[in-house]
Structures are given as structure tokens and as C-alpha cells.
From Swiss-Prot:
It is an enzyme of class 3 (hydrolase). The gene is pepT. One of its GO terms (biological process) is proteolysis. Its EC number is 3.4.11.4. Cleaves the N-terminal amino acid of tripeptides. This is Peptidase T. It catalyses: Release of the N-terminal residue from a tripeptide. Pfam families: M20_dimer, Peptidase_M20. It comes from Staphylococcus carnosus (strain TM300). One of its GO terms (cellular component) is cytosol. The lineage of its organism: Bacteria, Bacillati, Bacillota, Bacilli, Bacillales. Its cofactor is Zn(2+). The keyword Zinc applies. The keyword Hydrolase applies. Residues 11-30 are annotated as: Disordered. Keywords: Aminopeptidase, Cytoplasm, Hydrolase, Metal-binding, Metalloprotease, Protease, Zinc.
Length: 410
């Protein structure tokens, strides 16, 4: 299984599938179809029924091999890679039996070391796939793709392993927040699903942030600075004032666990007009709503000083905490917990300080927790995958399929 995972991840990683946040098409880049078409071919070679729609959502079915009816389970992974770093000409490297010492990344001056990345201590002795330092690896989420494909291959080649109906989806544009936007839950036709899009060994995630994005637009009055007294309103100064009125400790670099934050992503402008872009995050719905209200209150406080209401706030919700929906169907979490226990894996159920496709899918009627893939340091040249942990992820997929096929009278 290890060699199959290495081969799959390497082949998939070498295909450039970077998504583009500035594109309005779906998928946002045509090159994502290169991997989707390859996966369609590989799925059909396994004998699975497949279909891919115009938006690049590839669905496949492995039919049940048992007589009794059990829930249909889905497994999902996204094919696109992050736009935060170079994703072309990816050259995966293999490190056997990682000894814990610093690893130079190709001919660059970059290196993987445990002082900077202490989580690497947990993968000592493992086989790692890393980059050559010039690109990201794309294990987010091609490791998940490889794990699902490897598990399907095993089930096809081992019919003695009993399972119900399994649905698989490989999707575009997760990295730009649009993964589920055109996902047809009805067409997918599963009772619940799991995204294989987590990170470190043991992660079983069913709590995500509530998320919103806000654009603050400040309108100034620009006149000649020599005659500006009591006339000029500097939009940049308005933006600075707005940001200074937010709680200074409620920012990403000072929060953890269940603590939410305001994150100023971008600030640019001139005397005449300035814009600030924020993301707002909190696990608790009430605190989340209070954070959004805080932005509106600051707007109102500044606007009361001026006659022309120079500050505008445009805000929209991106996704909500999937725990609200997943907790309504506790078996969705109990199944993988039982599988983890059988496999000797201690589940890490800490909340995601982010979101997954499952965050949106759960509110679209498809409860979808997230499971580890064995990768870390996403979105940059320090990304790596533990092939050993990927093997365990495949075992989890197989275990879930078997667990669901068990009689329900236990």
C-alpha cells in the first residue's frame, strides 16, 4: 500500500491544479480538469460508475456488496491547490526513515527542521514526501485524493471486505472558498460524508469557525493640503481609526483554541478613498454575531462625527460552524470514533480554526466531518506528507466502510 500511495501522490502532485480567486468560472482554472479527467479514467478502470458535470464536480459510485440496506457514505477530497505559492513544476522528493535532522529542500536555502516545525517530531522514522523548495507539494488535498483512490482500489480487489454503497466526490476550488458552491447534494445522494482534508495523525474534526468577510470603505474629502484646515478628511486616517477601535488582542496572532478574532487582510487607499478587508471568525454563534455587530457599531461611532457618513461596511457570511448540523446526527461522529478505537488511533477532536468544504456542505444537508490525511505545512514550500500516516488514513476509510456495513442491532 505504501508504494501505491507514493506513486499516486507523486503523479497527482506533478499536475498543476492551482485555483484562481480572481476567476469567475467554475472550475476557476481549466487545468484542474487535467487531474479530474485522470481520476475519472482511473475510477472507470476500477469498474466504478462516474459522472462529471460542467462545473468540474466528479462523482463516482462503488455499489454495495451486501444484501441489507445501510446508509450511503461519501468520501470527498478537493483537487485544487493553493494560490498562496508557486504550484507549477512540482518535483516531489522522498525521504526514507526520517531521522529528525534538518532537511535541505533541493538547491534552495530553505530547510525543514523541528525547531521551526515541532510537529515533525511525530513523524520521525516515517517515509516523507517533501518539495524541492521551489513550489508547494499540493498534498492539500492530493493526499486525500490518493487515500480515497487507494481505499477504493483495495475494496474492488478485496470483495470479501463487506461494505454498503459508497459515493466519492473530487471537487474544484476549495482553496478559494467555493468548493461546495455548485455541489449538487441531491445528485450526490449520500446520507453523510467525510472530507479527507485534515492534517496531523488522529484529527477528527466536526467543529469549525463561523466565518464572515467584511469590506470597510472610507470616503475622504481631498483638497489641497495648503488649504485643508477644517475641510480635508483623510480616508486613510479614517481606516486607521476604524482598525484601532477593534480589540487589539482579538487577532489571529494572539488567539487559539475556541478564541475568535478579527483579521485585517488588506488595507489600501488614498486620501480620497480607502478600503480595509477583514475576516471575522468565532466558533460560538452568539459571539460571532456580536463581532459583526461590533463592526457596525464602530462605523456608527465614526459617522456621528461627520455629516456625510464617510464609513461604509459591506459584510457577508462565508460559512457557519458545522457542529450545529453534525450534532443533530451523532452517528456521523460515533462511526469514525469506533473505527479509530479499533485501529488504536487516539482521536483529536479539537475544533478547526478554519473551515472545510464540510462546513458548507453540512448546512446544505450533507453532514460532513473532516479526517486527517497525514500532511502539514500547507500552502508553501515546507509542505510535507507522511506516507505512514497516509496508510492509516486509508485504513480509516476502509474501517468506516466496514463499520457502516455492520448490523445495526448492536
Amino acid at each position: 500500500m505504501k508504494e501505491e500511495l507514493i506513486d499516486r501522490l507523486k503523479r497527482y502532485a506533478e499536475i498543476d491544479t492551482q485555483s484562481d480567486p480572481d476567476s469567475e468560472s467554475t472550475p476557476s482554472t481549466e487545468k484542474q480538469r487535467d487531474l479530474l479527467n485522470l481520476l475519472k479514467q482511473e475510477l472507470e478502470e476500477l469498474g466504478l460508475q462516474t459522472d462529471i458535470d460542467d462545473n468540474g464536480y466528479l462523482f463516482a459510485t462503488l455499489e454495495s456488496n451486501i444484501a441489507n440496506e445501510v446508509p450511503t457514505v461519501g468520501f470527498l477530497a478537493h483537487v485544487d491547490t493553493s494560490h498562496d505559492f508557486n504550484a507549477s513544476n512540482v518535483k516531489p522528493q522522498i525521504i526514507e526513515n526520517y531521522d529528525g535532522k534538518p532537511i535541505q529542500l533541493g538547491d534552495t536555502d530553505r530547510e525543514l527542521n523541528q525547531e521551526v516545525f515541532p510537529a515533525m517530531k511525530s513523524v520521525e522514522g516515517h517515509t516523507l514526501m517533501i518539495t524541492d523548495g521551489t513550489s508547494l507539494l499540493g498534498a492539500d488535498d492530493k493526499a486525500g485524493v490518493a487515500e480515497i483512490m487507494t481505499a477504493l482500489t483495495y475494496l474492488v480487489e478485496h470483495p470479501e471486505v463487506k461494505h454498503g454503497r459508497i459515493r466519492v466526490a473530487f471537487t474544484p476550488d476549495e482553496e478559494i472558498g467555493r468548493g461546495p458552491h455548485k455541489f449538487d447534494v441531491k445528485r450526490f445522494d449520500a446520507d453523510f460524508a467525510y472530507t479527507m482534508d485534515g492534517s496531523q495523525y488522529g484529527e477528527l474534526q466536526f467543529e469549525s469557525f463561523n466565518a464572515a468577510e467584511a469590506t470597510i470603505t472610507c470616503h475622504g474629502v481631498n483638497v489641497h493640503p495648503g488649504s485643508a484646515k477644517d475641510v480635508m478628511v483623510n480616508a486613510i486616517k479614517l481606516g486607521e481609526r476604524f482598525d484601532s477601535m477593534l480589540p487589539e488582542d482579538e487577532v489571529p496572532e494572539k488567539t487559539e483554541g475556541y478564541e475568535g478574532f478579527f483579521h485585517l487582510m488588506n488595507f489600501n487607499g488614498t486620501t480620497e478613498k480607502a478600503q480595509l478587508k477583514y475576516i471575522i471568525r468565532d466558533h460560538d454563534r452568539e459571539r460571532f454575531e456580536a463581532r459583526k455587530a461590533c463592526l457596525l457599531e464602530i462605523r456608527d461611532q465614526i459617522n456621528t462625527v461627520y455629516n456625510n457618513d464617510p464609513v461604509e461596511v459591506d459584510m457577508y457570511d462565508q460559512y457557519h460552524n458545522m457542529a450545529e448540523k453534525i450534532n443533530e446526527v451523532p452517528e456521523v461522529i460515533e462511526v469514525p470514533k469506533r473505527v479509530f478505537k479499533k485501529l488504536g488511533i487516539e482521536p483529536n477532536t479539537e475544533p478547526i480554526r478554519g473551515g472545510t468544504d464540510g462546513s458548507q456542505l453540512s448546512f446544505m444537508g450533507l453532514p460532513t466531518p473532516n479526517i486527517f490525511t497525514g500532511c502539514d505545512n500547507f500552502h508553501g514550500p515546507f509542505e510535507y506528507a507522511s506516507i505512514d500516516v497516509m496508510e492509516r488514513a486509508v485504513e480509516v476509510i476502509l474501517g468506516i466502510a466496514e463499520e457502516i456495513a455492520q448490523p445495526t442491532d448492536k
